[in-house]
Amino acid sequence: MKPVYVVLAAIAGLLLIVFLGYYNLYNSAVRLQEGVNEKWGNVQSAYQRRADLVPNLVETVKGAAKNEQEILTKVTQARAGIVGINEEITNAKNPEQLEVLGKKINTAINLAYEAYPQIRSTENFQGLQVQLEGTENRINRERDLYNESVKEYNTHVRGFFASMFLNTEKFPIKEGFKAAAGAENSPNVKF
């Protein structure tokens, strides 16, 4: 084989290796950049879940608490009616009045018993706390995954060969998630 062909084959082989290296470098950068974008989308999705969920949960718990307050008020009034009947029994003059008052007591007791469902506002508040905690944990997890993805991407594009060959406009350095000023203070949920 002629030396010219050997040199040309070596140059062609070297160019092929450089091209394949650049091809791999570029595709890896694209894959990592899309991974960063996906993770940020997941963070945004978790924020949206919180924005949708928390006001609805708060209103649901408020409504249940209000309903239970109304029920307790009615039960208290029914009990007060029974106390009033007890005073009438003391003042009753004949057995017929006592029988009518006895029926009133039975009716009041039955109404109080039927109107006194199992009170669940404490369970609702605990459920709200669990939902809030779960939502905040999801958001935090998505932020962590985003930051890990940004780190992997930035490490790749700032590497020696990548920084020499990749266009910094197409593959800029990404910023990790940073908390807003005052975010170290947790938000207050008001009822």
Which residues does each PLM region occupy?
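A helix-centric hydrophobic-segment signal that preferentially recognizes long
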Residues: 1-191
